[in-house]
Amino acid sequence: MYKGYITDIEGIKVGHAQNFDAGTGLTVLIPPKGNTASVDVRGGGPGTRETDLLNPVNTVSEVSAIVLSGGSSYGLAGSIGVVEELEKDGRGFEVPSGIVPIVPQAILYDLDYKSYKIRPDKKMGSEAYKNASFDENRQGIIGAGTGATVGKALGKEFSMKSGLGSATICLGDLKVSAIVAVNAMGDIFDDEKNKQIAGILKNNKFIPTLEVLEKISEKNSLNTTIGIVATNGKFSKTELRKIASMTHNGYARAIRPVHTMMDGDTIFSLATNKVDADINLVGSLGAKVMARAIANAIYF
């Protein structure tokens, strides 16, 4: 297991809500005001909200919250509850008539885990927002990771349970942290130990996903790994887009294969803009801490 949680970065709150019986849930990250955010979507089957707004050429740089959830496209309804709670708190992009909360979201497919009919909704989003705390540190089967599984190329029977993971790296005053819900088709590795820790499990042995794909056409598995990399460093929206891109290297180190046509792999990047930092260093640490967070999604 690796140390740290994304709430180690001052000013960040995290809240979870879930339905354990239905096997689905939602996680919300609420950053401090004055933040900057961007995103990099790599998977071939993404499900997202407000990601176009985070393109560096577009208007808004600051977000009110970021949501990760299960429920596939149905789960996008969860962010509405977060938006409504933010409006009550007076948090959002100012417009002549009031405010518009900016809440990007990414979803994962967990509809086949337990219940197809019960998904994250407005009520669950509101609950997660109200549960948000500066002290939140739970990992595993919680929030967006409630229905997450991995190693699905041979079907549900041989897949393994995954969840939500987080980790932090501190270097002097600089902090880089990640939180991720791991719902990958592929195998999961602890990159720093060069050890497979989850994947297709048959007769108590791992079967490499790539070997399976060489023999069969994997069409039925629907997957996605969705995460956030955050830092207290000072960065522009354009720089954060690059940091999100570099952090995807952490996905590639820990998930094999990754970024397939049936994955919706997405990474949001967030800066609280407190300390001077080098983009190359933070992008490299982002990849390292994301790989650690992915491992923790299995360990916890």
For the regions a protein language model found, what residue spans apply to each?
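Short Gly/Thr/Asp-enriched flexible loops that form oxyanion-binding sites at enzyme active sites
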Residues: 78-83
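A structural signal for small-residue-enriched, beta-sheet-centric alpha/beta enzyme cores
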Residues: 1-73, 77, 88-300
